[in-house]
Design a protein with these regions (language model features):
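Left-handed beta-helix
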Residues: 1-155
Length: 155
């Protein structure tokens, strides 16, 4: 097994390095038993996916979901969730990184975003859909189109 190094000095390179972890056979394989991963354990319950109704299904595809997360009738695709993130019903999150303690209200649409810690996203919020609107709300939008919501932001 050879070593791994990646420049993550910009928003776009940080986002891409994280998205690369979701590939079927990533260059940095977090599941390689020959190269153990040492990390802090939060001692939280496992992630939970709930609701299975017609248009209200808690699900995630091609994503990494940490302990303590609840996907309650919302859906994720190509996302990385830190501990204690909640995705509420009818919300869709794609190509995004959500840090610890983020709550996504109902009917939200989030695309290609990095949401920092302790952010409560109200119902019907759209992030990463319209860069001009995101900038008006004080969010950074990178050259590559990644929207960053700062830690503790009030939306």
């Amino acid at each position: 097994e050879r070593g791994y190094w990646r420049d993550v000095g910009s928003i776009d390179s940080y986002w891409q390095a994280n998205m690369d972890l979701l590939d079927y056979n990533p260059e940095l394989n977090l599941y390689c038993m020959d190269w153990p991963l040492r990390t802090y354990n939060y001692n939280l319950p496992p992630a939970k996916f709930i609701w299975e109704e017609n248009d209200r299904v808690g699900m995630a595809t091609n994503s990494m979901v940490s302990e303590g997360c609840i996907i309650s009738g919302g859906s994720l695709s190509r996302c990385i969730l830190s501990p204690q993130v909640r995705i509420n019903s009818f919300s869709n999150v794609t190509d995004s990184i959500l840090m610890e303690n983020v709550n996504v209200g109902r009917y939200c649409e989030i695309r290609k975003a990095i949401i920092d810690k302790n952010v409560d996203i109200p119902p019907y919020t759209k992030i990463g859909i319209n860069p001009d609107e995101d900038r008006k709300r004080g969010f950074l939008v990178s050259a590559g189109g990644v929207t960053v919501v700062p830690k503790g932001a009030i939306l």
